[in-house]
């Protein structure tokens, strides 16, 4: 018998680049599945407090004006953690 995980959260992040040291998260998206059925979602922009490079705007469609009044990462992560609860995360 194969065990299938049917309760989980799928997580997606958009960032200002690929360097974990130098780049920042600019958007968090998550979708909750219960019994394999989509039941809820979470999304927020994150103010990276740095300029979003033009190439990243081309890829993501997210520009400085879209994040300038967004939450900072600590507040955004607190909201994400509340959303996640104790669910397994796939990303």
Where are these regions (language model features)?
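Conserved non-catalytic scaffold segment of RNase H-like nuclease domains
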Residues: 1-91
